[in-house]
């Protein structure tokens, strides 16, 4: 960044999704680059932040991982599914389940869907809403967990190993 744009950039890592926006709002950060637009908009609406999009990077697809099963067809009725508990990533996971035919959502375009928005759950999946950074840690205790790359990659998980995953257009 220094050579190409004459910018001094300091990279600061956070372990959750809320703190970077709070730091941006209180002036501790000048910019952040970690969230997709629906999540940013949810935070603006929920917390009254005055943010603007300065540019776009990319968002890694979210994947569903299991240490117990090799395919979604093996998931038993009543399987315990861990979802990220932030507004848009939880919606992304549920939309992916809807698109795979595992559940039916009332509105499959609603990016902030939660389990309350499930119209049909024919396999009686049980959902646990977990803080995203904790999802790799709970993976051994659930049947399947939706984990985005921010936390999957450091935990040694590869999107290639996901039972289901978003496409590159996500």
Language-model features and meaning:
Residues 54-103:
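A conserved helix-loop-strand patch within extracytoplasmic ligand-binding domains
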Residues 17-48, 70:
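Pocket-flanking alpha-helical
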Residues 36-37, 149-151:
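Short secondary-structure boundary segments
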Residues 1, 16, 20, 39, ...:
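Stable alpha-helical elements in mature extracytoplasmic
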Residues 11-22, 109-137:
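Short helix-initiation/N-cap motifs at beta->coil->alpha
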Residues 25-35, 79, 102, 123-126, ...:
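Alpha-to-beta junction loops
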Residues 42-54, 69, 146, 154-166:
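Ligand-binding "clamshell"
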Residues 1-8, 23:
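Short, polar/charged alpha-helical segment
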């Amino acid at each position: 960044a220094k050579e190409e744009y004459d910018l001094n950039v300091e990279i600061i890592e956070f372990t959750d999704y809320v703190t970077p926006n709070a730091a941006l709002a209180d002036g501790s950060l000048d910019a952040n680059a970690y969230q997709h637009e629906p999540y940013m908009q949810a935070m603006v609406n929920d917390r009254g932040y005055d943010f603007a999009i300065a540019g776009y990077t990319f968002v890694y697809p979210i994947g569903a991982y299991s240490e117990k099963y090799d395919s979604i067809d093996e998931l038993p009725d009543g399987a315990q599914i861990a979802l990220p508990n932030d507004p848009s990533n939880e919606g992304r996971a549920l939309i992916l389940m809807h698109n795979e035919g595992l559940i039916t959502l009332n509105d499959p375009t609603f990016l902030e869907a939660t389990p309350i928005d499930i119209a049909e759950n024919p396999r009686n999946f049980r959902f646990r809403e977990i803080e995203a950074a904790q999802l790799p840690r709970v993976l051994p205790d659930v049947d399947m967990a939706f984990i985005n790359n921010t936390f999957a990659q450091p935990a040694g998980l590869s999107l290639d190993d996901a039972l289901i995953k978003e496409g590159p257009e996500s």
